[in-house]
């Protein structure tokens, strides 16, 4: 369970403090695939960084399981991050490492298992993302979709119970994007993981998520099931879901 209560965050700007998050309240149940949608600069990625302890809020509470993120020491945060697999939008592959070593990197760095276990885990991940036989390829020889698949394999190789994806299909064509979304859903179901995913592709997000949160100008304007989002009468939610164009959000 991820529980966010009253979280707010601002940053300094040329005209004073700029409020990025405003009194955010949401719950992500254990084993849920939760999607976050919203226009650019609505605070989605900032919220992800706070959930993982990479950024502190100005106020509010963030619970991951029984652990309070906002007051945790650096040592405690380091231990808490073992619960997370992460794939951020700019989380590029290491160009100088093979596909195998890219996927193995978090496993080796965080857990130091025997190399035999590393080989088994990486092989299993490559099979799951349909890249068996790509172990010795370099990132420069991969397509955009293949790179995303390697990123998914790297984010899940440690078998962390919580996985964070920030725009996992950004920049891909529609067919490849759908394949990535279907892969993420299949991975989540197989592991019964708790997943929080940011995406600007609402149509595809709604096909795979259990719950969805919609953000606008730092506020969470909707938090509910995917089915509830599709029938909501809240004007801004309707505009998100149905692509209405009668004026700006």
Where are these regions (language model features)?
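Conserved ABC ATPase signature
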Residues: 138-142, 146
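Catalytic Walker B motif of ABC-type/P-loop ATPase nucleotide-binding domains
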Residues: 163-166
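Conserved ABC ATPase "signature" region
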Residues: 68, 115-134
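A short, proline-enriched helix->beta-strand linker immediately N-terminal to the Walker B motif
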Residues: 157-161
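The feature captures the beta-strand-to-loop junction immediately N-terminal to the Walker
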Residues: 37-39
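Helix-to-loop junction immediately C-terminal to a conserved catalytic motif
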Residues: 52
């Amino acid at each position: 369970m991820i529980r966010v209560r009253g979280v707010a965050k601002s940053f300094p700007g040329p005209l004073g403090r700029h409020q990025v998050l405003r009194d955010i309240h949401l719950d992500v149940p254990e084993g849920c695939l939760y999607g976050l949608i919203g226009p650019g600069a609505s605070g989605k990625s900032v919220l992800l960084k706070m959930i993982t302890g990479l950024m502190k809020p100005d106020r509010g509470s963030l619970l991951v399981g029984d652990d309070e993120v906002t007051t945790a020491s650096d040592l405690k945060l380091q231990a808490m991050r073992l619960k997370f697999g992460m794939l951020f939008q700019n989380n590029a592959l290491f160009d100088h490492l093979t596909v195998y070593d890219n996927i193995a990197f978090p496993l080796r760095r965080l857990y130091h298992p025997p190399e035999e276990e590393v080989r088994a885990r990486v092989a299993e991940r490559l099979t799951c993302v349909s890249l068996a036989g790509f172990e010795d390829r370099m990132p420069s020889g991969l397509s955009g979709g293949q790179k995303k698949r390697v990123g998914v394999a790297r984010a899940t190789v440690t078998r962390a119970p919580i996985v964070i994806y920030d725009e996992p299909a950004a920049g891909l064509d529609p067919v490849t994007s759908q394949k990535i979304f279907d892969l993420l859903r299949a991975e989540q179901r197989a592991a019964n993981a708790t997943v929080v995913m940011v995406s600007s592709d609402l149509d595809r997000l709604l096909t795979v998520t259990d719950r969805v949160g919609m953000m606008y100008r730092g506020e969470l304007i909707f938090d509910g099931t995917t089915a509830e989002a599709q029938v909501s009468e809240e004007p801004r939610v309707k505009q998100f879901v149905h692509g209405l164009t009668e004026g700006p959000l």
